[in-house]
């Protein structure tokens, strides 16, 4: 075959292949048009429930992806529109003991994985799920930028959330808002998240609702505007949030803001007998919200704010019981104080919580009176009102030989049942300042929920070995 014949043969073959490709394309186009215009489909294969576009692409051919995506978007919009504001209609369940709810082992896993440096963690639920929350430091435990993460406030912190009992990684964390102080809660329709950022003398809060910024609040005392560091609570769409601006070791200006869909309905200055308020841990029941806070100025006993979200009013006092629950603190006295701080905290403190329910009252505190180590739950009937109330029952959560930290309350208000199950978390701080062989400060989380059974207890430490990081 001479060269001209070879060229003719090759051209003819290419022409035939091209014609076949065009015909296949026409047939494929016709099939696609037919599938899109077909009024109904008795498909035997069920559509996946994924609402995320990337998940849908994995599970479907491209021409089906568009159909599924549009359908799921409609479902999401309809579900959000049909959801009602949550109403706090139930009381607390009887609490006889505490069972394990979640544990993320973040520091242990972070020894060889991309786990984010965090602090100030908490738990918050919505109608679909409960998630862990924390303030990230914008770096991983093993990253070089983890040097200096002992500091609370920087431009690199943000509020993140991630699946319950998983460690917070660069792959599974969702940024809720940017800042170094936060709170977040779901009203039944959508989530409100608040983040505070900026320099100490000029910080501001941005209020996000349904993942969009809605309102801003500027500093009023120019001294580290700050908020709860755990979840807020909503009643029929009204979500009270406690803010403080001012000295941590002297008088400060505390305000209670009432939000609805991220917008301010009202705010009022602190009233009642509490002298200093920081880092409130709140829960809701019977249409009211109760917040147990930190008096960093004078009190080893904890101040309490009781909020009526319907009337948008509040009052405050101290837990009357002589069972002191801040840290540091003196030994428990014989008689407590209801309207004044009990001295002995040396201008210091730690975030904490309680469930104040008459004879069903439980208080949480570190076991150590001098450092953030150990954690225990104590049943102290009528602790809010009885200045001689004593523990009648207890449960150790973390042994005193292991580090603890902040703690706070949360509840799943959408769980089935005739009452709300009380829950709490404990921050397990590792690294600096106590473990100064490493350059970072981070934490893991353990969380517990109440049981009507009398369950056994166990130690739930962080469990990471610092020498593995050296």
UniProtKB/Swiss-Prot annotation:
User: What EC number is given for this enzyme?
Assistant: 3.2.1.18
State where substrate binds.
119, 153, 278-279, 294, 372
Keywords (A to Z) from UniProt: Calcium, Disulfide bond, Glycoprotein, Glycosidase, Host cell membrane, Host membrane, Hydrolase, Membrane, Metal-binding, Signal-anchor, Transmembrane, Transmembrane helix, Virion
- Using the UniProt annotation, give all residue ranges assigned to the region (Involved in apical transport and lipid raft association): 11-33
Q: For this UniProt entry, which segments traverse the membrane?
A: 15-35
Q: Which SUPFAM superfamilies match?
A: Sialidases
Reported modifications of this chain: N-glycosylated.
Q: List the cofactors.
A: Ca(2+)
Q: How does it sit in the membrane?
A: Single-pass type II membrane protein
One GO molecular-function entry: exo-alpha-sialidase activity
Query: Where does this protein hold Ca(2+)?
Result: 295, 299, 326, 348
Q: Provide the residue span(s) of the region labelled Head of neuraminidase.
A: 92-470
- The glycosylation sites annotated in the UniProt record are 42, 52, 63, 66, 87, 147, 202
Q: Where is this region: Hypervariable stalk region?
A: 36-89
**Quaternary context:** Homotetramer.
Q: What does this protein do?
A: Catalyzes the removal of terminal sialic acid residues from viral and cellular glycoconjugates. Cleaves off the terminal sialic acids on the glycosylated HA during virus budding to facilitate virus release. Additionally helps virus spread through the circulation by further removing sialic acids from the cell surface. These cleavages prevent self-aggregation and ensure the efficient spread of the progeny virus from cell to cell. Otherwise, infection would be limited to one round of replication.
Query: What else is noted?
Result: The influenza A genome consist of 8 RNA segments. Genetic variation of hemagglutinin and/or neuraminidase genes results in the emergence of new influenza strains. The mechanism of variation can be the result of point mutations or the result of genetic reassortment between segments of two different strains.
Q: What is known of its domains?
A: Intact N-terminus is essential for virion morphogenesis. Possesses two apical sorting signals, one in the ectodomain, which is likely to be a glycan, and the other in the transmembrane domain. The transmembrane domain also plays a role in lipid raft association.
Name of the protein in its database record: Neuraminidase
> Which organism is this protein's natural source?
Influenza A virus (strain A/Whale/Maine/1/1984 H13N9)
Q: Gene that codes for this?
A: NA
